[in-house]
């Protein structure tokens, strides 16, 4: 995902065993590559790689402040992200942004994003505002989650800059592998933090069974195990899409229109436009084509 300010922009048996092991290894390598690709897609454009705080003590202190007197059960917190926010309202002093991914045992297809704006002094963090209304899709289930603050200056108006929370999830089973990336944008104004837009940024699915059938079919045609082209079979059984976020110079109700389009040549000229309705972008969510 990227952001810009533009309008358009041995024997047969032992051989078979080795071949089977090689295939399993390729599948594992491919799945790991899928996870890595998702993470790289999420971080490629972001300043958060260096700004996100990874120190557990600081994360837990910020999480405790965010939770306040109504905390979520500890086993429901599936991820925490914390970062300084240099582009927040200057009148508020040095700011920090924090997010927690919360999923209770009764929830399976989505999870809550608890997000807050903090200040910090010699006594620790202090909560200025928080929101618990945003949810992210975790279907088919939350498996390997990734959470980070995105503090690129998302300038939604001439005077106001939003910040983002990046969520990633990779689910792997014996049959398939699914990866999802979602960006949620927030504004902090008048003592309140509010989600203003959410977009699917990265999505992929890999059909392992289909790839295995493809390799077996190719082996049969060639009459010699190992002559198949696994990369080709992997590609044929992988579906993925990535979206690019940008802002148009055109404004609606004093805020820049937001554009989302598929990444790459396939997305040239195709974009979905979102306009400001006074409080958020409308429609509020982009879930893909």
Q: What do these predicted ranges mean?
A:
Residues 23-36:
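Bacterial N-terminal signal peptides that target proteins for export
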Residues 44-46:
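N-terminal signal peptide c-region/cleavage motif recognized by signal peptidases
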Residues 49-75, 173-289:
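Acidic, small-residue rich beta-repeat scaffolds with periodic aromatic anchors
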Residues 52-109:
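Solvent-exposed N-terminal domain segments of exported/luminal and surface proteins
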Residues 83-92, 146-158, 244-253:
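Structural signature of eukaryotic scaffold interfaces centered on beta-propeller domains
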Residues 91-101, 156-169, 252-259:
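Acidic/hydrophobic-patterned starts of short beta strands in beta-sheet-rich repeat architectures
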Residues 95-156:
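Short N-terminal edge-element motif at the start of the domain
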Residues 102-107, 168-178:
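Short, conserved, GDST-rich strand-edge loop motifs in beta-rich repeat architectures
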